[in-house]
Design a protein with these regions (language model features):
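N-terminal glycine/serine-rich phosphate-binding loop of ATP-dependent small-molecule kinases
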Residues: 1-99
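Carbohydrate-associated surface elements
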Residues: 106
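Conserved small/polar residues in nucleotide/adenosyl-binding loops
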Residues: 118-120
Length: 120
């Protein structure tokens, strides 16, 4: 019987990581790629979704296939995870309208949060 493979990719704040495993849970290949946050103003932290998120997914999936020599048709599932509830406005074709605002570290709405807390 032909072996089945499973790919997992995680996009994080500073890097994206990927792993390819077989049906026994053995690691066949791993790959990590770094990406940078932009800091356009004090307390503002952003990612370029096309480059950092989609680009990393493409780089990692291709690297895992190349390193492992596994045929893409033998990969039965791909699981992804990513950083938390970031803000990425998109157009009607789901194309980013701006860089993503990173949840948890971007502080540009601090004043608005305090106003909201005062009314809860």
């Amino acid at each position: 019987m032909k072996e089945s493979y499973f790919m997992g990719i995680d996009t994080g704040t500073n890097s994206s990581k990927g792993v390819l495993i077989n049906s026994h849970g053995e690691i066949i290949a791993e790959h990590t790629t770094e990406h940078a946050m932009t800091n356009p103003a004090p307390g503002h932290y952003e990612h370029d979704a096309d480059k950092d998120w989609w680009g990393d997914l493409c780089i990692i999936s291709n690297a895992l296939i190349e390193k492992s020599k596994v045929s893409p048709s033998d990969i039965k599932a791909i699981g992804t995870s990513a950083l938390g509830a970031d803000c990425l406005p998109v157009d009607d074709q789901c194309r980013p309208l701006r860089k993503a605002i990173l949840y948890g570290i971007d502080a540009r709405a601090t004043d608005e949060i305090e106003i909201g807390r005062a009314h809860v």
